């Protein structure tokens, strides 16, 4: 009779860690998390909306995606960089800034707030703004 986790060579410490992580996840207030992420996305959108050639929208979260996200669209005839150039420039920052670039060829990128704290949101907005206001 093999115990749970034994076929995968999992020790009791790892199994207890997994169970504790699950307990913490279940205790977390998911509505509060959604509100926190939505507020961070709103801050990103509000900060970037005032830049020339930039428009933003907030996705709904829920069934569409785990967290509400800020979708940023560039009018590449107005902005000093194309979206692809901006994404590349952000990745050269120190520390690097990674945004969702699946639609960069279409002039859109996404800022996902899930792994950002309030200070990091400010940094991301600052770096995007700096790149889009340079000539």
Predicted regions and their residues:
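Active-site C-terminal subdomain of aminotransferase-like
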Residues: 1-52, 58-66
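Conserved C-terminal alpha-helix-loop-beta "cap" of PLP-dependent enzymes
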Residues: 45-129
